[in-house]
Amino acid sequence: MKTNVKTDNKKGIVIAPINDRTFSLSEITASPALDYVGIGFDENYNCYLPPVNRHALAKLPHQNAQHGGILHSRANMVSATYEGGKALSKMEMRALCLNLIQFGDVGLLKVRNGFGQVVRLVPLSSLYLRVHKDGGYSYLMKKSLYDTAQEIYRYDAKDIIFIKLYDPMQQVYGSPDYVGGIQSALLNSDATVFRRRYFSNGAHMGFILYSTDPDLTEEMEEEIARKISESKGVGNFRSMFVNIAGGHPDGLKVIPIGDTGTKDEFANIKNISAQDVLTAHRFPAGLSGIIPTNTGGLGDPLKYREVYHYDEVMPLQEIIAETINQDPEIKNLLKIKFREQNFAK
């Protein structure tokens, strides 16, 4: 782009024409929207839409280390004291817990024998389970998250035990209890991606190549511009040789826009956003695998574990057991039970 010569008539100052070119790398694709949008209705499948995008919730653990680790740790803690039984295997109980914590609800399909009696339960992925207006359910099954082909299974309300975490804004679906920390998890991920690009691109944010040398020909200018443009990509930008015959020592300057190595807030963003994620999950830092930065450490993990068990693990276990055991088709042999945790020294 060329700027025309302009004259300030009041001061008689001539503003010289400027040849300016800008070069930038392609932008990172924005993270999926994870706002709470409330309940919608899908006319195509005749079902309600969850308040938070389920596909985005499914991808979120892969974007943030703290969030993904805490989800699995919470699922392990809740399912650890499950005694097992005919209704659910221990692996299925863990799948139940992970779905419930990650998505805020989980559906259990009743498997019946030839007489119509319930003989076991199977947890369905909350990613694909949808609720109908009449109380029934659709399971929009896919082989993988990115598969366009899908099969739709429809179930009556009596065939599904639906466990959900209470949401005061709607009572159709549950809602994950960490919603307030989603943006912090995304910010933490964005900071990491930015730093990766920073190092991959030669550890610089960018620069201005400033030339005032009259001996710089248009051919040389085009060649320099081409070289800079071709330097985009991982590790490609290193150095450039420019020879201007009879040029001036200060005729060509590189002016850095900024050096994120010393000026950015990467460490602060990572630390604060990680704390937000822990707070959203109400998960003790002493159990999260965080390396303490002070001499005092993070306290006694055994004490944290005991308190966390009584305040967070047991209430979730009670919700699971109560919802399953109160179903009239669940007989004594299929009832769910968690053993008491003994923290005695």
Curated annotation (Swiss-Prot):
Gene Ontology terms: biological process: symbiont genome ejection through host cell envelope, contractile tail mechanism
Pfam families listed in its UniProt record: Phage_portal
Keyword match RNA-binding: no
Keywords assigned by UniProt, alphabetized: Capsid protein, Viral capsid assembly, Viral contractile tail ejection system, Viral genome ejection through host cell envelope, Viral genome packaging, Viral penetration into host cytoplasm, Viral release from host cell, Virion, Virus entry into host cell
KW Iron (keyword) present: no
Localization in the cell: Virion
Origin: domain of life: Viruses
Primary residence: virion
GO cellular component, one term: viral capsid
Disulphide linkage map: none
Subunit structure: Homododecamer.
Function: Forms the portal vertex of the capsid. This portal plays critical roles in head assembly, genome packaging, neck/tail attachment, and genome ejection. The portal protein multimerizes as a single ring-shaped homododecamer arranged around a central channel. Binds to the terminase subunits to form the packaging machine.
Protein name stated in the entry: Probable portal protein
